[in-house]
Amino acid sequence: MIRFSVLYPSTDGATFDHDYYRDKHVPLACATWGLDGAEIDKGVDGPYVAAVHFRFPSLEAFQAAMAAPGTADVTADVPNYTTITPVTQVAEVVSSP
């Protein structure tokens, strides 16, 4: 299992529209990549204002999703909800309850 996390660092003067992110952007990403859903975090206190975690069954599935033509549309949608440059992490899930 591969987890793809996108984190948005708290940045002075930056904007982030949580409603648009939850209602439009993340569903667009899920539909594009053929996923049933994702976990969305809204930062309360700490270094990130928001994060999302997508799960893929394998590294190959993740790589195929990133290479899909619709991924460009997902990336192009970012300015519609934030001025923050996100940080990403790709991780292998080694344990899950």
Language-model segments: what does each one mean?
Residues 1-97:
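Macromolecular interaction modules
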